[in-house]
């Protein structure tokens, strides 16, 4: 595991996390190599790495929920989920520098990221 910091950028959907992602990306922070393409609802882009979004979506689906309604029930992450998180982090660490991840869904999984990344984790919460 790398010692480089990891910036976790998250906030509620439509809270300007993409605008912050845009600023950070333009400043040189690597937010992923497979960013979701711009769309009419977000013309400059989402700055979300598709593998991370897919991973988070699968975790939600396996907990019988989605990003639109998570409810107040606990999200249970299995060893398989943690293994996929470790694999994602290892892949991103391979770039050899600090990197970031942006996904509103990530706010539901902060304890898992904090536990795995430890002191490397840096958090930027966007509230609007």
Regions found by a protein language model. Name each.
Residues 54-58, 87, 91, 115:
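Charged/polar, solvent-exposed surface patches and flexible loops
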Residues 17, 107-111:
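Short, well-ordered alpha-helical microsegments
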Residues 1-83:
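PAPS-dependent sulfotransferase catalytic core
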Residues 102-104, 113-128:
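Conserved phosphate-donor/acceptor-positioning beta-strand/loop module used by diverse small-molecule
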Residues 5, 77, 90-97, 116-117, ...:
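Catalytic phosphate/metal-binding cores of nucleic-acid and nucleotide-processing enzymes, i.e., regions
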Residues 72-74, 95-104:
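Surface-exposed cleft-lining segments at the edges of enzyme active sites
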Residues 85-86, 110:
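Generic structural signal for well-ordered alpha-helices
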């Amino acid at each position: 595991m790398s010692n480089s910091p990891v910036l976790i950028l998250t906030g509620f959907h439509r809270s300007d996390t993409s605008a912050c992602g845009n600023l950070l990306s333009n400043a040189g922070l690597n937010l992923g190599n497979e960013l979701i393409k711009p769309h009419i609802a977000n013309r400059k882009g989402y700055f979300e790495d598709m593998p991370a979004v897919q991973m988070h979506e699968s975790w939600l689906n396996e907990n019988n929920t989605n990003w639109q309604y998570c409810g107040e029930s606990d999200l249970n992450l299995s060893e398989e989920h943690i293994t996929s998180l470790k694999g994602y982090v290892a892949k991103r660490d391979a770039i050899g520098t600090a990197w970031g991840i942006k996904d509103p869904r990530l706010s539901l999984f902060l304890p898992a990221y904090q536990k795995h990344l430890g002191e490397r984790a840096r958090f930027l919460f966007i509230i609007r």
